[in-house]
Amino acid sequence: MMTALILKRVAQAIPVMLIVAILTFLLMKLLPGDPAILIAGDGASPETVERIRVELGLDQPTVVQLGQWLWNLFHFDLGRSFLLSQPVSQAIAERLPVTISLALLAFAITIPVGIIMGVVAAYLRDSWFDTGVMSLALLGVSVPSFWLAILAVILFSVTLGWFPSAGYVPFLDSPLGWLRSLILPASILALFQIGYLARMTRSEMLEVMDQDYIRTARSKGVSEYSVLSTHAFRNALVSVLTVSGYIFSLLIGGSVVIEQIFALPGLGRLLVQAILARDLPVVQGTMLFLGFLFVAINVLVDILYTIADPRVRYD
């Protein structure tokens, strides 16, 4: 049963990924500029530019170019970077561990802190703590991440000297150095999602705590801790699980800005540099990879959601 469910969800994701690939290609075609001119240089002759256009297949109709690009994509060929002079897939593979490390560390901070704050806020409804959690949630959607990141660098790196202001240390080189290089950007990245998760957890907990079986458990003399942990939280956790996948996607997307500020050599920084340098194959490949990653995360969350709540059925 579970194998059939997984195969079904993966099969449903394939056309979505195909649409993502086609939209990515078409968006790149809408951008101004000629890749052949970028490769040849401003002083190149028209003959040189035309020769490069033919070599890249840019002289072909858009439909033919799309078909060739999808064929190359099927063979895991994302093209070659103009700026880096290396395959796009290699550039992505080299920088992916940084982005994943940043997102996972931020996720590890967000989930326990956000859930605990949401549970306590629901239990202490209308208290000063509850008000503080709601204020933090509002802060998360109001304050730009780059502004808070710059303040954090000034305070914790420049003034106090607790953390490095930029750079990345691979985990295998130094686990402690890896943690020091990521803890500040990961905390800033997590802060905006902690408020959202806390608000979501609080809402689910309040809804569950108003159910009849919670009142029945309390009337039977069940301890308040057991009511919260065993009955209320376990049932509210199903919805929180769904949100966690969305949060992880947001953390990966938010890493674009954070990586720029903290000079982390991840996918976000690669994408920004490629956009500024008009390195279209890298822009195209990175956007496509991130799109596929988001689809894969959603599929995984759907599967976990069904495992956590067997009542869920897909048509």
Curated annotation (Swiss-Prot):
Compartment(s) of residence: Cell inner membrane
Keywords for the protein's UniProt record, in alphabetical order: Cell inner membrane, Cell membrane, Membrane, Transmembrane, Transmembrane helix, Transport
PANTHER family, alphabetized: DIPEPTIDE TRANSPORT SYSTEM PERMEASE PROTEIN DPPB-RELATED (PTHR43163:SF6)
Keyword Cell inner membrane: yes
SUPFAM superfamilies per UniProt: MetI-like
GO molecular function, one term: dipeptide transmembrane transporter activity
Major site of localization recorded for this protein: membrane
Protein name: Putative peptide transport system permease protein BMEII0209
Membrane topology, as annotated: Multi-pass membrane protein
Gene3D superfamilies assigned to the protein according to its UniProt record, in alphabetical order: MetI-like (1.10.3720.10)
